[in-house]
């Protein structure tokens, strides 16, 4: 009966997942495989003839890659602008060193060209690369070599990613916190203080005339004139001895003191009719609108003192484009705040709701984009493939945020659930598929091709780790994402993801993966047509 159950793909799938999680929780000297253990169990099951259908693996792959792209999209373009050049150089180093290693070992051991390009595709776990290798050589040797190199291409990257922090003696959680502090440095922490108006140059002038926000970056949220506290408008006039309360970075608050007068600590209390509330932006119509376009002071008599996004406080400048899930700190009369709440949506339930239409539509667009075939001079051609197409489309849609009524975003819990589900399906299928021929390919082709494939996997990662840390001095989290992206290794990214609560590896992976995929295909075509 148990044998019959093993031939049932759904039973085998969940058994592999359960055993994988059990194995993944075992720690040896602080090192564990986590979710990556699923692929090791799958390899064992595959060796004994258990197969998970390819369609389930592809389904899991598109879910995993799509959710990676949706999460990484907003940070992808920022990362590309700020450190993209460095990550791309490391990626090119990975691809070129893999190909040079392959060509060097080809001549050293007399390996035929079809086997070499198959080894490169397998060592870097690139299915599009295999397709190009077979097409370019018209030889079955490419697929045999791919099958030999592929298992270590998967396992080797996982183990390298797991061991690298231990070898470098770097605590990934501390590294993530350090990078978070650096990231916050780009968005200085906002503070609040009050000022006594003592500068004669602003006596009798309105806030519009002194242009405090443009000159300093601080937001004036309250005014005390004589004994009355109010929310100032652009036309509010300042008088000697008035008090104002402002919100901004330390630099902005210091500059405001130079402009208006003496700085004091504390806050001005709100009147009984006034409130300060944190409101969520959940209404689709408001997404991508600039804060200044809402005219909250004119329409509701309210002021936004800060905007919180992804754990960071942003200064509420008029040109700030609002995003779904932004939390706006609003000060005003009770009725005015109610009006702002209606305008923004302020519906916490919508943050956890999951609309499957954008997910399905995004994946459809990604699959279609992956089918495109782009031709280059000299007879070279490139197709993004399933993984590349879905990732590129997800990155673009996530950065756009909204198209008409369609919201291209996903709540954190929903993203995490779909990502984990997709990953487990993918790892189970890939493992059983690689495991079924593992022993046979060793017996048929010996250890030489396996050793060459292992070298093609390891050498680029060692070079990338050395250059990334010692030459470019990038963070280990960025390096892990770049290595897994440069090696086009989705299981490797999963291993990095499971080690730290940070999306930095995912962003780096998404930054370099499309580039790695394109250049790997081009390099394989060059080797297949030029190297003899």
Curated annotation (Swiss-Prot):
Superkingdom, taxonomy of origin: Bacteria
Molecular functions (GO terms): monoatomic cation transmembrane transporter activity
Domain annotation RCK C-terminal: ranges: 179-262, 263-346
Cellular-component GO terms for this entry: plasma membrane
Keywords: Cell membrane, Membrane, Repeat, Transmembrane, Transmembrane helix, Transport
Membrane topology: Multi-pass membrane protein
GO biological process, one term: potassium ion transport
Record-annotated membrane-spanning stretches: 7-26, 30-52, 59-77, 87-109, 116-134, 139-161, 356-378, 388-410, 446-468, 509-531
Pfam families the UniProt entry points to: Asp-Al_Ex, TrkA_C
Compartments, record wording: Cell membrane
Family note: Belongs to the AAE transporter (TC 2.A.81) family.
Name of the protein described by the UniProt record: Uncharacterized transporter BF2680
Organism lineage: Bacteria, Pseudomonadati, Bacteroidota, Bacteroidia, Bacteroidales
């Amino acid at each position: 009966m148990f044998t019959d159950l093993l031939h049932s793909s759904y039973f085998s799938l969940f058994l592999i997942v359960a055993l994988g999680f059990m194995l993944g929780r075992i720690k040896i000297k602080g090192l564990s495989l986590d979710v990556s253990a699923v692929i090791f169990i799958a390899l064992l099951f595959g060796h004994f003839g258990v197969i998970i259908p390819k369609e389930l693996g592809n389904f899991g792959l598109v879910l995993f890659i799509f959710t990676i792209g949706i999460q990484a999209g907003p940070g992808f373009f920022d990362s590309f602008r700020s450190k993209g050049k460095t990550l791309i150089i490391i990626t090119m180093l990975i691809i070129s060193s893999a190909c040079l290693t392959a060509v060097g070992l080809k001549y050293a051991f007399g390996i035929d060209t079809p086997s070499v390009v198959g080894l490169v595709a397998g060592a870097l776990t690139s299915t599009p690369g295999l397709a190009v290798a077979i097409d370019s050589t018209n030889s079955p040797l490419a697929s045999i070599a791919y099958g030999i190199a592929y298992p270590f291409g998967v396992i080797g990257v996982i183990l390298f990613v797991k061991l690298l922090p231990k070898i470098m003696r770097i605590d990934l959680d501390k590294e993530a916190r350090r990078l978070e502090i650096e990231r916050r440095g780009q968005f200085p922490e906002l503070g609040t203080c009050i000022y006594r108006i003592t500068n004669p140059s602003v006596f009798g002038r309105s806030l519009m005339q002194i242009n405090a926000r443009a000159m300093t970056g601080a937001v004036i949220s309250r005014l005390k004139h004589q004994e009355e506290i109010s929310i100032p408008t652009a036309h509010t006039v300042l008088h000697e001895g008035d008090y104002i309360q402002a919100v901004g970075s330390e630099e902005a608050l210091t500059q405001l003191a130079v402009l208006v007068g003496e700085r004091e600590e504390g806050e001005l209390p709100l009147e009984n009719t006034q409130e300060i509330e944190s409101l969520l932006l959940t209404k689709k119509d408001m997404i991508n609108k600039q804060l200044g376009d809402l005219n909250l002071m004119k329409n509701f008599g309210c002021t936004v003192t800060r905007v919180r996004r992804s754990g960071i406080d942003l200064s509420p400048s008029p040109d700030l484009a609002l995003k779904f899930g932004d939390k706006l700190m609003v000060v005003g009369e009770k009725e005015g705040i109610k009006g702002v709440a209606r305008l923004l949506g302020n519906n916490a339930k919508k943050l956890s709701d999951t609309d499957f239409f954008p997910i399905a539509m995004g994946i459809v667009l990604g699959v279609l984009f992956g089918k495109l075939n782009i031709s280059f001079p000299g007879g070279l051609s490139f197709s993004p493939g399933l993984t590349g197409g879905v990732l590129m489309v997800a990155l673009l849609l996530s950065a756009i945020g909204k198209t008409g009524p369609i919201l291209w975003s996903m709540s954190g819990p929903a993203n995490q659930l779909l990502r984990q589900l997709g990953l487990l399906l993918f790892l189970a299928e890939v493992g059983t598929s690689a495991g079924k021929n593992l022993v046979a390919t060793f017996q048929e082709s010996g250890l030489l091709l396996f050793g060459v494939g292992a070298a093609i996997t390891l050498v680029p990662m060692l070079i990338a780790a050395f250059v990334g840390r010692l030459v470019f001095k990038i963070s280990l989290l960025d390096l892990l994402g770049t290595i897994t992206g440069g090696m086009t290794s989705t299981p490797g990214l999963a291993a990095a993801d499971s080690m730290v609560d940070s999306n930095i590896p995912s962003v780096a992976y998404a930054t370099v993966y499309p580039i790695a995929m394109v250049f790997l295909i081009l390099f394989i075509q060059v080797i297949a047509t030029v190297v003899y």
